[in-house]
Design a protein with these regions (language model features):
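N-terminal Rossmann-like dinucleotide-binding module
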Residues: 1-57
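Beta-loop-alpha module in the N-terminal Rossmann-like domain of NAD(P)-dependent dehydrogenases
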Residues: 27, 57-115
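Contiguous beta-strand/loop segments that form the cofactor/metal-binding neighborhood of enzyme cores
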Residues: 173-247, 261, 268-283, 301, ...
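Hydrophobic residues in well-ordered beta-strands that form the structural core
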Residues: 63, 100, 125-127, 243
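Mid-domain beta-loop-alpha active-site segment that forms a flexible
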Residues: 128-135, 158-187, 270, 291
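A contiguous active-site-proximal alpha/beta segment in oxidoreductase catalytic domains
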Residues: 105-162
Length: 320
């Protein structure tokens, strides 16, 4: 049963957004359009970002996210990854339900603590692995058999976003989440190599993940590429499935019946599913335990890719 914090008895949920960068702005827009939800406040250390958000939505805009504690029923945490654990923990303790952008945390122990806290406080905790909604549209997850092998590639030009963590935690973690949806077997070996050119962390990584049943997944991710590419290839005993997530093209030589990838709004679906779970008390499509599993594999890949050649840059302002 949902415990409303506003005491109004109207059923209107007060939503907050922490961080109004590229993702945070979209989260705010989604909440503003949902029935039964009031976008109440946003928090961002940038005065320019606060002014823009306040102008766009006519809401309270504060510099310190702590000012929102106890004043919202649910919140999207879209701040830099290194700040996720502290902010999520504070809002769970304040009684709010939380949707945190990936990764759930930057440490497995932190993720475990957040999952336990959400359960102890009877609060919903879910993670923004929106690619899952895109992938689910193909219908491939409806088939129980795992592929023999898998390849994933995700590359794009440098934008400066997500530079507080490696490209593995920033981008590859999407593909790791999809990988674990297709491969139920345990990971037994990880090998990787990476390089850094624009940040303190790996900006490009090649990785191979081997599973207990002998299957393998090969992954490539880059945030310093010249062109944008996103796709996957899954090989089965009766053929192969290749998906281009940029062109929305699906090539299928297997006996599985798949659906075309239509234009969609995965972030909107993610926010709407979160709100529905809060209102109805049900489960979210992305369980925090699944996000924790993707994080664990991501950290194994980070360790395997070290050392990477890195140069020291000026410290960037983080939302702490």
């Amino acid at each position: 049963m949902l415990r409303l914090l506003n005491g109004q008895g109207t059923g209107v949920l007060r939503a907050g957004v922490i961080g109004t960068g590229a993702f945070g702005r979209h989260h705010a827009s989604k909440y503003a359009k949902l029935a039964g939800v009031k976008l109440s406040a946003i928090a961002d250390p940038s005065s320019e970002a606060r002014r823009a958000a306040a102008a766009a939505h006519g809401v309270l805009a504060v510099a310190d996210w702590r000012d929102l504690l106890g004043k919202v029923d649910l919140v999207s945490v879209c701040s830099p990854a290194v700040t996720h654990a502290a902010i999520v923990r504070a809002f769970l303790n304040a009684g709010a339900h939380v949707l945190v952008e990936k990764p759930i945390a930057t440490d497995v122990d932190e993720a475990d603590a957040l999952i336990a806290l959400a359960e102890a406080n009877n609060r919903i905790l879910t993670v923004g692995h929106q690619e899952r909604f895109v992938f689910a549209r193909t219908g491939l997850l409806d088939y129980a058999d795992a592929p023999l092998s898998m390849e994933c590639w995700r590359a794009g030009p440098w934008t400066g976003r997500g530079a507080d963590v490696s490209v593995v935690l920033d981008l590859m973690i999407h593909d790791l989440d999809l990988m674990h949806q297709l491969f139920p077997s345990n990971v037994v070996d990880v090998s990787a190599r990476g390089r850094s050119t624009h940040s303190r962390h790996a900006d490009e990584v090649n990785a191979t993940v081997t599973f207990e049943n002998g299957s393998q997944a090969k992954l490539f991710v880059s945030r310093i590429a010249e062109t944008r590419r996103r796709g996957m290839l899954a090989v089965y005993p009766d053929g192969a499935i290749e998906i281009d997530f940029v062109t929305r093209e699906v090539r299928n030589s297997t006996t599985r019946v798949l659906h075309p990838l239509t234009q969609d709004d995965p972030l909107g679906e993610s926010v709407a599913a979160f709100v529905k779970a809060v209102r109805e008390g049900g489960a979210t499509p992305i369980r925090p335990e699944e996000a924790r599993r993707a994080l664990e594999t991501a950290l194994l890949i980070e360790d395997a890719a070290m050392p990477v050649q890195s140069r020291v840059l000026e410290p960037q302002a983080l939302y702490a």
